[in-house]
């Protein structure tokens, strides 16, 4: 009976080893240090925690100048909004005992004010003259104005044509040798009044200083016969 007790202990120890092998875990050695596993686990967790920190540092960092420029733009935008709302509040002429309307209340009141004004204008339109804007008359009026602008009416002023074009051309009388070059020429009809006469600028007739009273006129022979409008030559 005393010898069988150690045999039971060996079989129990072998069963414990078999169960440990089935579980897949290594048997704890008698001299092993369990604190190493804890240290390894801590190191692994620290590495995982350092990875996202490294990724954040990899992103491009915005410079200080860019941040300041963005802040200035944002302040300018807000300032413009506030100025616009203040102008709208002044146009609405609200009186809240010194209090300022909120932005939503200002917009709502402006919408109601515009709707009321539009209804009043549609109900009783004020008489007025024709509008000169092309947008107010539609495409038909724009087409009419385009046609009239393309073909302007002819001017009602005097004609610019030369009066000499309608009159028959009459040859000019020859100048006297003793007359100045700028003296006016005599008309062909002045031959009947006497030789050696020339018409002055005032309409009076004067005698050329070098022309004789008895001599014939200095015009070429047969001038009166060949001049137009003087009739047929005599035989």
UniProtKB/Swiss-Prot annotation:
What's a single GO CC term here? Answer: cytoplasm
Q: Which InterPro entries match?
A: bHLH_dom (IPR011598), E-box_TF_Regulators (IPR050283), HLH_DNA-bd_sf (IPR036638)
Covalent S-S links between cysteines:
none
SMART domains under this entry? HLH (SM00353)
**Function summary:** Transcription factor, which play a role in limb development. Is an essential player in the regulatory network governing transcription of genes implicated in limb morphogenesis.
Show the GO MF annotations.
DNA-binding transcription factor activity, RNA polymerase II-specific; protein heterodimerization activity; RNA polymerase II transcription regulatory region sequence-specific DNA binding
Return the CDD domains for the record.
Answer: bHLH_TS_bHLHa9
> Taxonomy-wise, where does this protein's organism fall, top ranks first?
Eukaryota, Metazoa, Chordata, Craniata, Vertebrata
| Keywords from the named record | Cytoplasm, Developmental protein, Disease variant, DNA-binding, Nucleus, Transcription, Transcription regulation
bHLH domain segment(s): 65-117
Q: What is this protein called?
A: Class A basic helix-loop-helix protein 9
Bias (Basic residues) ranges? 55-67
Q: Which PANTHER family match?
A: BASIC HELIX-LOOP-HELIX TRANSCRIPTION FACTOR, TWIST, CLASS A BASIC HELIX-LOOP-HELIX PROTEIN 9
Is Flavoprotein among the key words of this record? no
